[in-house]
């Protein structure tokens, strides 16, 4: 019988859910897994081979629309789900499985969901500091999932598949050089406190180009201005080795470009988790956030930050107005880390 997973709203969190997904499939390989999520995070689930069907949530962020949710849930009844894992903590995310009459509905307590979940767990954050472990714990009976260290099985690192035909198209369309490609993701949608200075990025890009690499810039449409600013700061004669794709790729296409890269440089972002899940050498720059909660889950990843007493603060804007955790992280440190990471697959 099929299982319905109500997936997270954010790309990085969806990748963190892959540990649970792969675990569920390993225990019941013949049971289909259906993923319900918003379109932007659902694109990631399409690259998880354990997910048998993806279902787009037809409601915008914050929309309740009880009548429409009821009608949508009634359609899901025909799939005869025997259980549902509700990964977001919101009230809205638990409504549809309950309305669909799914008999087992498993999730953390969250937002006023007492009567909507049949297996309600109370989260002690200190016992489950990593998001991947919080999701994984839902796959076990509550009495076997008291802390991350006590889980009967540790979650596997997330893995996303790449599409070779898509990669070939991207190489041809944008003149990408598989032999020397380095992906840079300079955007920071969370807020400016998470962003390494653009002039640092432009210096890093220049040094990598001087070393013979081709640079591809990746990000969402919200990152396009930062990528244009970065491009403008690179000497014009060197821009033939710089391809700006920020805002021009879908999430699956970003997965495929990253899969072609010799190394990837990102902030703590959704694309950081994408890079980790493709297994590419990764340098992740952490500012106000902490790798304890949402680390890049890959043996090919290293994290960098500049140690300051106020780290981590988890603020969108630096309350002390110095952003030293990132601004004091030197180009030399990042360049050396990228060079060392590239050597790991040389």
Model-derived features with residue positions:
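Catalytic machinery of carbohydrate-active enzymes
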Residues: 1-346
